[in-house]
Amino acid sequence: MASLFKKKTVDDVIKEQNRELRGTQRAIIRDRAALEKQEKQLELEIKKMAKIGNKEACKVLAKQLVHLRKQKTRTFAVSSKVTSMSTQTKVMNSQMKMAGAMSTTAKTMQAVNKKMDPQKTLQTMQNFQKENMKMEMTEEMINDTLDDIFDGSDDEEESQDIVNQVLDEIGIEISGKMAKAPSAARSLPSASTSKATISDEEIERQLKALGVD
């Protein structure tokens, strides 16, 4: 019973209209088919009367044929009008659905904008940038310290290996000459094993120097 008193939506109304238009279109097609059948019968009757020389009957039947053909032409015009109405109804339905979708989207965007705080979002992004730069600076300073500790410990050995490899590629004679040449003693500076302490004050100072609050 509740469905009987339910208010029809726009879609329901449009569906009903489309059903009525389709029914009208089918009725027009049936009428046209009947007119075409009657048209053929009249044409045969006119030919029959012409064969027997009945001019008066031919004139009467010819007038009926003209009237019938005009009526058939009208069915094509009406059918085109019904098709146009059906197309227009579909276009209107599509436009209304688009308007409904835009309305829903606008409401969603409005709700999101109410929840969002631009100042808070900006502050969050600035804090992220600040902390990210602090992390990068800390990592860079640690890497520099580690490089100072470990760089150069194997420089002498690696350099000698490279020299030996090149001499082997050039030839034994040159290698022999190079072996007799006095080698320059190099003293590597001892790497400091003391680890630099990175304070928050130092990081803040460098961030301010970079223009990051």
From Swiss-Prot:
Modified residues (Phosphoserine): 199
GO CC term (a single one): kinetochore microtubule
Outcome when changing residue 29 to V: In FTDALS7; cells expressing the mutant protein have large cytoplasmic vacuoles with an accumulation of the mutant protein on the outer membrane termed halos; cells with the mutant protein also have aberrant localization of CD63 and an increase in MAP1LC3A1 overall indicating a defect in the autophagic pathway
Effect annotated for changing residue 104 to N: In FTDALS7; cells expressing the mutant protein have large cytoplasmic vacuoles with an accumulation of the mutant protein on the outer membrane termed halos; cells with the mutant protein also have aberrant localization of CD63 and an increase in MAP1LC3A overall indicating a defect in the autophagic pathway
Tissue expression remark: Widely expressed. Expressed in brain, heart, skeletal muscle, spleen, kidney, liver, small intestine, pancreas, lung, placenta and leukocytes. In brain, it is expressed in cerebellum, cerebral cortex, medulla, spinal cord, occipital lobe, frontal lobe, temporal lobe and putamen.
UniProt record, GO biological process: autophagosome maturation; autophagy; cognition; endosome organization; endosome transport via multivesicular body sorting pathway; ESCRT III complex disassembly; late endosome to lysosome transport; late endosome to vacuole transport
Motif (MIT-interacting motif): 201-211
Residue ranges of the region described as Disordered: 179-199
Pfam families named in the record: Snf7
Membrane topology: Peripheral membrane protein
Family listed: Belongs to the SNF7 family.
Entry comment, domain topic: The acidic C-terminus and the basic N-termminus are thought to render the protein in a closed, soluble and inactive conformation through an autoinhibitory intramolecular interaction. The open and active conformation, which enables membrane binding and oligomerization, is achieved by interaction with other cellular binding partners, probably including other ESCRT components.
Disease: Frontotemporal dementia and/or amyotrophic lateral sclerosis 7: A neurodegenerative disorder characterized by frontotemporal dementia and/or amyotrophic lateral sclerosis in affected individuals. There is high intrafamilial variation. Frontotemporal dementia (FTD) is characterized by frontal and temporal lobe atrophy associated with neuronal loss, gliosis, and dementia. Patients exhibit progressive changes in social, behavioral, and/or language function.
Identification of the protein by name: Charged multivesicular body protein 2b
